[in-house]
């Protein structure tokens, strides 16, 4: 089943259920995609307006980037579900003999690595989404500036949620050096892009209250 083909109602019903997927990872990817789509909407509301003719080409380039990024995040909704399957299978492997224990440890290590790769990819995409939101807030139509602020907040939430999904998997890794490297990669993205998202929000909020 391709989760991205479900209706909103069906997706949320599955999310609310005990079904293994979607979970927090897929939901984060969807929220990030919604954030990017909001930014793209700001761009579409800006193009073709005489007032913004000077930034028309820049906005069109942002829109092209946003469309590609949204599709990437949509694909990561399903990718997160796909990554959970081998992880669940690994936990179910027998470990009665030393050979079985060794095999389970190896399979689990590989599955945990795969389960970290998807949220790290979602994080990377959300960082791009926050950069786009910043550009849309700066250059886009003032009539849609609130949506640029929402875009930044959506991508920020998805970024933080995905960091939690990295952490829950690295915590279970026996290779602590590898786990630390993945945690550091996530931490660097948080350190750089959470302040940018907050900056976009504060800028938009200040403009709306002026």
Listing of model-derived features with the role each one plays in the protein:
Residues 3-21:
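Short, hydrophobic/aliphatic alpha-helical segments
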Residues 129-132, 144-204, 210:
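Preference for long, well-ordered alpha-helical segments
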Residues 30-34, 62, 69-76, 115-125, ...:
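Amphipathic alpha-helix face/heptad-repeat signature
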Residues 80, 84-153, 157:
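Amphipathic alpha-helical interface segments
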Residues 41-53:
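Transmembrane signal-anchor/signal-peptide helices with a preference for the extracytoplasmic
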Residues 50-89, 189, 196:
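A structural-propensity feature for long, helix-poor, extended segments
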Residues 17-38, 144-162:
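Conserved phosphate/anionic-ligand binding catalytic regions in large, soluble enzymes, centered on
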Residues 11, 34-41, 83, 122-132, ...:
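Amphipathic, well-ordered alpha-helical segments in soluble domains
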């Amino acid at each position: 089943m391709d989760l991205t083909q479900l209706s909103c109602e069906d997706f949320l019903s599955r999310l609310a259920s005990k079904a293994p997927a979607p979970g927090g990872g897929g939901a984060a990817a969807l929220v990030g995609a919604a954030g990017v789509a909001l930014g793209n909407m700001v761009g579409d509301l800006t193009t073709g307006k005489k007032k913004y003719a000077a930034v028309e080409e820049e906005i069109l380039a942002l829109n092209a980037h946003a469309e590609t990024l949204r599709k990437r995040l949509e694909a990561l909704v399903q990718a997160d579900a796909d990554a959970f399957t081998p992880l669940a299978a690994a936990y179910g492997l027998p470990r009665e003999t030393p050979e079985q224990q060794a095999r389970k440890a190896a399979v689990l290590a590989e599955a945990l690595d795969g389960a970290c790769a998807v949220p790290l990819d979602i994080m990377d995409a959300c960082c791009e989404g926050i950069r786009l939101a910043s550009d849309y807030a700066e250059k886009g139509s003032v009539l849609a500036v609130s949506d640029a602020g929402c875009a930044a907040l959506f991508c920020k939430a998805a970024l933080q949620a995905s960091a939690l999904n990295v952490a829950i998997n690295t915590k279970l890794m026996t290779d602590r050096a590898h786990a630390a490297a993945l945690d550091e990669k996530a931490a660097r993205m948080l350190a750089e892009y959470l302040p940018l998202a907050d900056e976009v929000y504060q800028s938009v909020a200040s403009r709306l209250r002026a």
